[in-house]
Amino acid sequence: WAIISAMPRLLKEKYPNCKVYVPSIIALEKLFGNIRQNWGNWDNPFKIVNYIFDNNPYVDGFIDDLDDEVFHDHYRIYDKNKLDIPLIKQMLRFWQFEDNEMEDYIPEIYWTDEEKQRGDEIIKKFAGNDEFGGLMITNRFSGISPSTGEKYDVESNTKIIKSFLSKFKDLPFFYYTHKKPHEYPFTFKKCFDMRHVDMRLQLYIRSKAKFNIGTHCGIVDAVTRYSPSFQIERYHPNPKHNVLESNHYLNKNNYLEKRDII
């Protein structure tokens, strides 16, 4: 959902009289409840639609039942020889968008004033007025990919993460890690563990970070408009359509060059 989160606004800009609805948790349960285990890191992966689209002024509502035609990511125009065109652009081309009409496609989130206030309070409590980073280490750091069956490159992943964290060894990090921090082959300055924080607040806090770094995932994708994001590539050297031109994708060949951007 994160990588297409600008779509409601872009549709309204091009077609001012259109209505934009997204499926509710109930609708997603009806459609995909039998495969929800594919998203093993989430207690309920269908809640993500609310994490991304709540309070969005361009969304006309969440619907529980889908009685008419549904436009989804199979409706897209793509170049089979260039698979790394962002998915949202492929979908918008189906809607007759020209390139200049979808330049501002980077993910966006609309927080409530209450969410902003609560997020600022957490930042103030744990980081004060100092800069801080965001760290996200998921189960894609090590082990075997459930989708491809291939082993993740732990050696390269470790080298990449260590390189960034050693450069910013004095920077405190708000973090989420799949395992306990001490179980990883790297260390960092811990500011606050966000594991049990409301996801919308996590996203807000990450949006205020000096930068975010970690394994490639939608949570970091969601805040790349607001905070520089560095993510370990999932499909090097053949990126897929779940890319964003605002992200910095890290691999064993480019991570030192990318690190010097900050």
Named regions from a protein language model:
Residues 1-262:
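Catalytic machinery of carbohydrate-active enzymes
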